[in-house]
């Protein structure tokens, strides 16, 4: 099935890209969520408009992403106190991307979307220092050290 993306889809493309996907993936995932439209002549014109708008936004987006990167990497330490931790350093719950976003904001950093946070695994389940990657733009990624402590 030939589709034109209307939003960025990881491992597939950016808005305006014409992609060939399996029918089930297109019908059951991309189309219902509004991430793509069926490729027709009119849709191709619409994709060109989307691509032009994306190019204008990307310059502004790249500059903004670099500013956010400097703000995030300028934070001296981001500490997250977790109430439920065993003496061995293992958490009874887990630290999610939303918890990391709240910790960054509390430390004086910018307000981020939880989908931009790249955890080492799906969740953090131990205390100590963990390296976090924040994907701000396809070309800009900020690195951050999160210290999880029992509180």
Swiss-Prot record:
Record's keyword annotation contains rRNA-binding: yes
InterPro entries, per the entry: Ribosomal_bL9, Ribosomal_bL9/RNase_H1_N, Ribosomal_bL9_bac/chp, Ribosomal_bL9_C, Ribosomal_bL9_C_sf, Ribosomal_bL9_N, Ribosomal_bL9_N_sf
Annotated GO MF terms: rRNA binding; structural constituent of ribosome
SUPFAM superfamilies the record matches: L9 N-domain-like (SSF55658), Ribosomal protein L9 C-domain (SSF55653)
One of the GO BP terms on file: translation
Gene Ontology cellular-component annotations: ribonucleoprotein complex; ribosome
Keywords: Ribonucleoprotein, Ribosomal protein, RNA-binding, rRNA-binding
UniProt key word Transcription: no
Similarity-based family: Belongs to the bacterial ribosomal protein bL9 family.
Protein purpose: Binds to the 23S rRNA.
PANTHER family linked to this entry: 50S RIBOSOMAL PROTEIN L9 (PTHR21368)
Protein name: Large ribosomal subunit protein bL9
Organism in which the protein naturally occurs: Mycolicibacterium vanbaalenii (strain DSM 7251 / JCM 13017 / BCRC 16820 / KCTC 9966 / NRRL B-24157 / PYR-1) (Mycobacterium vanbaalenii)
Gene behind this protein: rplI
